């Protein structure tokens, strides 16, 4: 026995081992003696120091079999940790394997024996200490650039290190390591104390060494395959693939290199190249939502996903209509002329396309094709639109031929690498080539046939060797062409893509793109013909040139730049001419350059201060004529929608505010003369600018917008403050946003106007009016002080508008405290007051109130009221906005008595009221909505609230011409909103009066009136939603079609296109045109959820026969019966969920989606009310419900938040709402709460939800709380969803890797 204190315990160990080695002591006896010594010295076992002593003793002076047996015995008795020993040997043996082949062979045997029983080596209290020792030995923190003491993380790194080192050794031994991208392997670094010289006793055994080396290489490769095949090891490696992507990519490349080039592998009896490559494939170490690989996920997969195969099956065989339904809905929704959006359609659709690609597991080819087909369907739905003040074909063509190509360009340019961008361009090419297989969608509307033919002609001329790029191609006569040059929508799309540099002219040579080539090219046109090319060369902007350029869109950015330069720097007449041209065809039909046209027009509204400008007045005054031309030129419904689609509304509003502020400060005596001889005053410029500004926010909507709880009505945030806030956000730069072509363009436009943030406070006069407008909405008029400037303005306006009436009667302004004298009224009635426009707008509410009060008391006839108000609006057209504001507030207050529309005092609707009501009923009936109370007939007289009667009487005094269009476009939607909010039948009465005025608008007016039915009858909303589901799913023979899909949902527009009858209105169109007026959007979303739940049962009953349904009940996942029927049913379930999510998102926006996910869905799961059915649904139907709900919730979230983290605000909201929902699920899985729904529904929902997140939205998983992830994974494990639980934990990142490793180790094999 060694005397304590004289020598260390490790000296004793070495001495004991040396004596045992010399005497050939049995390893068991050596181990027993060693154990006694260690206990004497109180050494804690297993001991890392002991392992280091023994390995150092072996390497290399005592590299003999008996000492290796000693080491093996110490490992068996857990005197040393096998993992520590393997780490030490990896550090000592592998780098010297060329000279220590026998030791290397023993190392491989020990590795094989211990790695596959790794669970046995980490159980116990010393787990963390052992792994820290392993990490120190192998320097894992340096290799993985991660300093951690979590044993699970260290275990994963250890496993990856051991397998990777073995792989590098095999590659090196075969001379293949130099062929890999990382030829200097970090795993083969030589040990610091390694002996270089080989023992002399092996020098004579070169032949046997070479044979042993060959066998060792084969064994190493076979061992690598066994590691990849082993469930526990492979799962641990999967954590590396999820969290160390670059290192895993290198590892995979090296295995592929080994599998494809190894000569030793050819001599293996148990492994071949194909097997090895299969073991490292993405099908085992990856996840995909692509149904094409689902069938390959068998028992050998690392991640089998369980129920995810059912989700992938949803995509199998699904039509484009079902996959891309949200695109069609968003495209059609953007055509609503009652709504402008502060967010660019390019940004919205780019995010939507990425979302649907991920959710559907689609390729970029399919994504691009889905975009093109949805865009073409949008155009085809309105080939012959009805007449009315609504967006027409120009807006739809803008979406199809400009916005969608810009979206595609955005998606391509988001590629981080040139190779990725090139692949995206290839997918674009193939999608456009496939588009040629849809001739029905490609037929151009009549108004663009000429443009399509010219696009085809351009391709033919190019292929024939002609160069028309610099000639007046825009005025070539198609009759001069010797071959048929008929074009279609694809030719226009290709030209739009070429203009954005995402295609080149090689597209012209695609098979079937054009009809052929020509041998004779038409002669060049004479130089004197006015066209864009001659203008660019310096031709003057005379009348002939302007007339030509207005009717023909520019073909290049250079042409627009030249025009913009003239508009800014030219003479006054040239500025007006250039602005006129910009507002022409280049705006409405210049699809290849439309984004630049919109940009230049917006910039023209913020012209620069001339360098030598020194006047006291604002420099905008000098641009009055040009500004007025632009404002009037972009004021049409289509033009405003085009600006909205391009995201220019915030900057447009910001540019209009200083114009309003400045010109509203001048009296009408300030005027200018246009080249045509027409005079315009400051009032005209102000009124046109002010009217356009008001169209950009929800000015024309009801003043009281009801939300539920803290959920605002959709769009209620569209205020001047909000528009400026969005505009100011464009000034903020970031690396991610700067890569976005659209965002960069919006930023440049904003900075061109001002590099500083702009606020409402910057415009004090506008702010005063805006606050008055808000006060008028909130309370009755008050505060008019006798003798004040406002009171004096009111008196002057009353004298001007009602002077003749006041000559004999009293007309009092509100709260004036006096009776107005009538003495001089008649003398002053023809005198026009000279007040600034802002002063008049302050007085208008009091003028209208006084007039309305006088009419109530009989001092003013209805005709005189309407005439006076029209005079006021003619005097200052902008006053119409304040009149609208006043009437809106007064109608909502409901304090005015109704008046009889009898044709004597007020206009009568009797002539066609019954016809209007009959048509409304027919429209609803053909859409599948039956409301008996709307049947025509009845003897009650037609009445309207006094303010509404006055309002409609005022509007019908306007002529329906271009001059009045921009003002009617402001008053019309407000009139409809007010009438819709009044008791029925106010809206039919208003529609009847207007159809008498504008007979050609009959279809539009009747359809508008039919939309308002849903505001008065909640059951009608439910019926319409039910019909949307039935039409989309094709579950019944609806008037439209029983085929289902987009065609049945959205049809072909709306209106009575047939003489003497009404064509059915598609339910989706009717819903999209009315939902914005719905106030309780939360309850609507609940109805949509209810319809989704019930539609699943309808799908099962329609798509699965009763016999198959019974068979499917008894067989898990229906794996033996009715595969085709089940696949069809699953496709329909996805379609129903997609429709539901889209409608909820559109109807309620972010607020309602948050309520749905946070409150509504959990409440549904907790509910136990099954009174509506005698017994619960079958297990299959219950599972289908779970699938539907999972897809519905994920798509709702994805539509609202996006699939990435571009917006920090969106990320925060997603974390909060999704986190709350998952915490609810975790609480249920932990047994803290109990759900009341069917177990099959609950389990399928959770499995489906997690499957969709991990396969389609991995970024979401990284944001989930660690404890929630643990609860979810434990719940999945209890249900046998082990692999899904592993994937979930792996995506949690480093924060869950420790738990994930422990989870994997302790799973049942």
Curated annotation (Swiss-Prot):
GO terms for cellular component: mediator complex. InterPro entries: MED33A/B (IPR039638). Disruption phenotype: No visible phenotype, but higher levels of sinapate esters in leaves. Residues 809-829 are annotated as: Disordered. GO terms for biological process: phenylpropanoid metabolic process; regulation of phenylpropanoid metabolic process. Keywords: Nucleus, Phenylpropanoid metabolism, Repressor, Transcription, Transcription regulation. It comes from the Eukaryota. It is found in: Nucleus. Transmembrane segments: none annotated. Residues 816-826 have a biased composition (Low complexity). Component of the Mediator complex. Component of the Mediator complex, a coactivator involved in the regulated transcription of nearly all RNA polymerase II-dependent genes. Mediator functions as a bridge to convey information from gene-specific regulatory proteins to the basal RNA polymerase II transcription machinery. The Mediator complex, having a compact conformation in its free form, is recruited to promoters by direct interactions with regulatory proteins and serves for the assembly of a functional preinitiation complex with RNA polymerase II and the general transcription factors. Belongs to the Mediator complex subunit 33 family. This is Mediator of RNA polymerase II transcription subunit 33A. The gene is MED33A.
